[in-house]
Amino acid sequence: MKKSIALFLIIGLGLVAASCGAKKAALAPPEVASSDEALFKEGEKYVKKDPERARLFFRQVIDSFPRSFYAQRAKLAVADSYFAEGDEGNIILAASEYREFISLHPLSPSAPYAQYRLGLCFYDKSAKPGRDQQKTIQALTEFKKTITAYPLTEEAKLARAKIKECEERLAEHTFTIGLHYYRSEAYKASTSRLIDILTNYPEYTGMDKVYFYLGDSYFNWQKADQSIPYFTKLVTDYPKSKLAAKAEARLKEIDKAPPVKTKK
């Protein structure tokens, strides 16, 4: 009885495999299968309506004509089709395909495109400030590779804009953490985070906030002398900031305070 069941399963699996093989064989007629260009164009027909079927054609180009001009285009088309589907799983597959393309064809005219799109794979799935920023960091790394490896390309220009956006997001994230420490009266931790913004993200658009809360962290930490440069910077460079008046009030408060007696 057991032998009969096993035999039945083997026959069943064989029929399924034969069926799948027949479908693959029937995927492209001989006149298409014998041409790299025809296979590629056949794949293009299905990219939007049946991306999985399109990828079968593209992979047939890659496997059957590995040194063809269309093999490189097919490799990118596979990556782009995964990217276009947009969900987490397909974006991971897209990133893998782009990375492999760059590894195989580093001097290809399409390499800058693949590198930039690799950055987008992480950028498009990155979280808002206040949440895990690992994907933003990965995106920033890949965009920086774009401008380093391909500095004169259009993709480098696009990457520079994305770098600014990534750094703005990371700065805002760091500020959110610093503000949390400030409100928790953990002033040593808040100053550390806020100084990190000054050091790593000097173009952050919320720099007036950084100067105020950095100054006020030192002020509340009983280090008023260290707060003066930051309050002064805020008042001088951002006079229209909503925090400028508070910074000015702090400076007056520090000025009126009796000098601290130093021990001899």
Name each model feature, range by range.
Residues 8-16:
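Bacterial N-terminal signal peptides
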Residues 2-5, 18-264:
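Acidic, polar-rich low-complexity tracts and alpha-helical solenoid repeat scaffolds
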